[in-house]
């Protein structure tokens, strides 16, 4: 069910049980014209709670839930995503075709930030960094992804004893580095887009998805270039162990 919004209202579950009012964020789902409220306490497993701003960024996300209470006078119901996720994790753990290493499964975007996102994969809430999203560098994930998206991923590791799951989204595609040495020989000049800066280096995306780690030619400095600008670079070397191309930025283009 799609999360339609959130509200800083009282924790309804606690109010109905104990007649106590507690200010708390709640997710709101409206399937079939019936409002279902998911208190923050029913969104996450104990010990895995997320900050309120994560819940605020989940508008549009698709979530599973179990109805735990119906308030007929108030015309709403209370749902638990936490309990629904337990059921999903049990299902995943008992399906060999889903949990085996290398299996291709689906995950759903819950919240997206500039450099990382939160996804749900069969009841497992997983933080995924930009490096695991795509081989190409992405300046801001929010320009490419949004809550509610369903995308493919690869199971990297599953520990049934501790219920731990690791996935990779980028490995559903072929690494563009393979064959890059033939497509972009050392000494060749290529047009690229600056996608980020880190630790004195500059990440440049080539049109075929290869990322080239660059520095500047002697006549330029960091302030001369901005993320998103097109540049001309020269390929200098490859490190096959790191699957990395290196080059030097010559000028803007």
Predicted regions, residues:
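Single-stranded RNA-binding regions, centering on S1/OB-family and related RNA-binding modules
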Residues: 1-253
């Amino acid at each position: 069910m799609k999360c339609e919004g959130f509200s800083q209202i009282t924790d309804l579950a606690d109010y109905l049980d104990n007649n106590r009012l507690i200010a708390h964020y709640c997710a709101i789902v409206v399937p079939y014209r019936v409002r279902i409220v998911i208190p923050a306490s029913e969104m996450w497993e104990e010990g895995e709670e997320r900050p309120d701003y994560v819940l605020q960024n989940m508008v549009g996300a698709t979530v599973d839930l179990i109805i735990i209470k119906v308030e007929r006078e108030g015309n709403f119901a209370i749902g638990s995503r936490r309990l629904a996720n337990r059921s999903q994790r049990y299902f995943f753990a008992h399906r060999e075709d889903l949990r085996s290493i290398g299996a291709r499964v689906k995950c759903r975007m819950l919240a997206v930030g500039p450099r990382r996102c939160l996804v749900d994969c069969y009841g497992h809430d997983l933080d995924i960094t930009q490096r695991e999203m795509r081989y190409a560098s992405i300046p801001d994930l929010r320009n490419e992804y949004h809550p509610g998206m369903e995308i493919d991923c690869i199971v990297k590791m599953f520990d049934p004893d501790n219920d731990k799951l690791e996935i990779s989204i980028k490995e559903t595609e072929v690494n563009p580095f393979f064959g890059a040495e033939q497509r972009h020989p050392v000494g060749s000049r290529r047009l690229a887009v600056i996608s980020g800066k880190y630790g004195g280096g500059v990440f440049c995306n080539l049109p075929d998805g290869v990322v080239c780690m660059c520095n500047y030619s002697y006549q330029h400095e960091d302030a001369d270039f901005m993320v998103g600008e097109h540049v001309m670079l020269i390929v200098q070397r490859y490190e096959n162990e790191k699957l990395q191309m290196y080059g030097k930025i010559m000028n803007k283009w």
